[in-house]
Amino acid sequence: MSFTSRLKKELFIKAQNLVPQHQLSRVVGKVAASENPILKAAVIHAFKTKYGIDLSIAEQGNALKYKSFNDFFTRALKDGVRLVDENPDSIVSPADGAISQIGKITAGEVFQAKGQSFSVEKLIGDPQLAQPFQEGEFATVYLSPRDYHRVHMPFSGTLTETLYVPGELFSVNQVTAENVPGLFARNERMVCLFDTELGRMAVVLVGAMIVAGIETVATGKVKPSGRIELQHHELKLEKGAELGRFYLGSTAIILFEKDKIEWEKRFKAESVVVMGERMGHTL
């Protein structure tokens, strides 16, 4: 790596610590939620142009019909655009995106990037709730700005707990993954825990800088409180059902117990996935 490239990375990481992350995210959130016709049209047009958003696959193909940028960003897709693998033994991708990392949880540690990892206990935010996933399997899926931003069930199960864990709001990308220790266990997140026929399963929705919010079907839109909040539920959700959505998106991490599933060998870091695609299978 050249000196210039290394310097740029170092400055980018340092800037993450200097920027008022939560205040900036709140400001962006207000703009994203605005229903002012001129403002929301301008923001949607700029975003659509910059990221090449394909509205031909969206349920609502007219950008002017969305009531706010948030409404546009969390847009539904047309029926049939994403097909959920119906094989009963399949584990499917919870979202459109790219695999950041995938594999086994080793000695309670989840691999983040070269030289970086984080403990599953810190990710979940509760030692007892994290215990079933020690030595289990994980997959981290990053949702880019241009992706479909709803998160779906990777396997059928009953939602038993949600755990809001407050935290920082570092940007999520390859640079921060490689340089911010414990990135995903430090950022604000919503942990969703399930009982399944395979045992326990977790889907963790991780926030990031300028993410305007996280929403789940059980809790509605999360209202940051600055403290850990545990809620109990009894909500059955089938594989492929919507679980939640990101407002300006980030990352979904799925966890399974040891010796319950196996990932398809073709998947590795940076593999592109779409919601409903087979990523693994039960053992």
Curated annotation (Swiss-Prot):
Give the EC number(s) under which this enzyme is classified: 4.1.1.65
Statement: the UniProt record of this protein carries the keyword Lyase: yes
Substrates-to-products reaction catalysed: a 1,2-diacyl-sn-glycero-3-phospho-L-serine + H(+) = a 1,2-diacyl-sn-glycero-3-phosphoethanolamine + CO2
Q: What is its main location?
A: membrane
Which InterPro entries does this one have?
PS_Dcarbxylase, PSD-B, PSD_type1_pro
Q: In which pathway does it act?
A: Phospholipid metabolism; phosphatidylethanolamine biosynthesis; phosphatidylethanolamine from CDP-diacylglycerol: step 2/2
Q: Name one GO molecular function term.
A: phosphatidylserine decarboxylase activity
Keywords, alphabetical: Cell membrane, Decarboxylase, Lipid biosynthesis, Lipid metabolism, Lyase, Membrane, Phospholipid biosynthesis, Phospholipid metabolism, Pyruvate, Zymogen
Name the catalytic site residues: D96, H152, S250
Q: Which family does it belong to?
A: Belongs to the phosphatidylserine decarboxylase family. PSD-B subfamily. Prokaryotic type I sub-subfamily.
Q: What does this protein do?
A: Catalyzes the formation of phosphatidylethanolamine (PtdEtn) from phosphatidylserine (PtdSer).
Question: What is the name attached to this protein's record?
Answer: Phosphatidylserine decarboxylase proenzyme
- From which lineage does this chain's organism come? Bacteria, Pseudomonadati, Pseudomonadota, Gammaproteobacteria, Moraxellales
